[in-house]
């Protein structure tokens, strides 16, 4: 769905309404004014992938979907946020990206240290490393590659 043809204020208003109704939530980009980090970006996620699928009008089985990575990322992040809320863990949640497109899918900040999560639908693609600009700049408590095989450790 391309939103660039719509008035940005109208899009913002609708996203704000959906957020107030607990249909979607937004993650802000994490930045501490390092020159190459995105400072203003936000990502929108659905609390329920079924609503996401309905909006996109796509109920194709996962094995046939071209957006399985985005679905997996949306699923894990929404479940992790629900888990943290349920457990009383009020870590600040972000994503991180540089102008060179280096990215960490999801970050939790708690007591000045960070836990970084990278989502991979394919369990064979877990040889992911923390981008060096992040590793060199911030205290990293843990880096986790989340797959369908291990996600329950972080959501239940």
Question: Residue ranges of each PLM-predicted region?
Answer:
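Accessory nucleic acid-recognition modules appended to NTPase machines
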Residues: 1-111
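Hydrophobic/aromatic beta-strand patches that form the interior of the parallel beta-sheet core
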Residues: 45, 94, 115-117, 144-146
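A short pocket-lining beta-strand/turn micro-motif at the edge of beta-sheets
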Residues: 102-104, 112-115, 139-142
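Catalytic cores of nucleic-acid endonucleases
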Residues: 121-156
